From Swiss-Prot:
Disulfide bonds join 30-93, 37-87, 38-77, 94-107. This is Class I hydrophobin 21. Residues 1-20 form the signal peptide. One of its GO terms (molecular function) is structural constituent of cell wall. It is found in: Secreted; Secreted, Cell wall. The keyword Secreted applies. The keyword Plastid does not apply. It comes from Pleurotus ostreatus (strain PC15). Belongs to the fungal hydrophobin family. Keywords: Cell wall, Disulfide bond, Secreted, Signal. Self-assembles to form functional amyloid fibrils called rodlets. Self-assembly into fibrillar rodlets occurs spontaneously at hydrophobic:hydrophilic interfaces and the rodlets further associate laterally to form amphipathic monolayers. Pfam families: Hydrophobin.
Amino acid sequence: MFAAPATMLVLAALAALSSAIPAAQTASKCSTGPVQCCDSVEHHTQPHVNNLLLGLEHFGLVKGLVGGLTGNVGIKCNPILLSSNDCTAQSVCCEHVHFKGNIAVGCTPANIDIL
């Protein structure tokens, strides 16, 4: 009964947060996995980001994200492969990636060289 509204809420929130942030292009590895190229990276305390995460928890789509969360949240992220350096947004290292990269938490700027 609530699945459709939950999906609509998540999609609307992701659409609202989608904005490209120019950054250096790179292809490397983080200690937590591959470097992610995210359309948007914002601090978890931003009201719209916090509301998105609370909504995901409320509908049972993720658990325990908000309580212990620190740092930044990446929106619409894709891993950057070693054979590619096609990131025209922000390159970050993230601790956990959810929903095939649509939400990534614990993100920090990738401290890497341009290849």
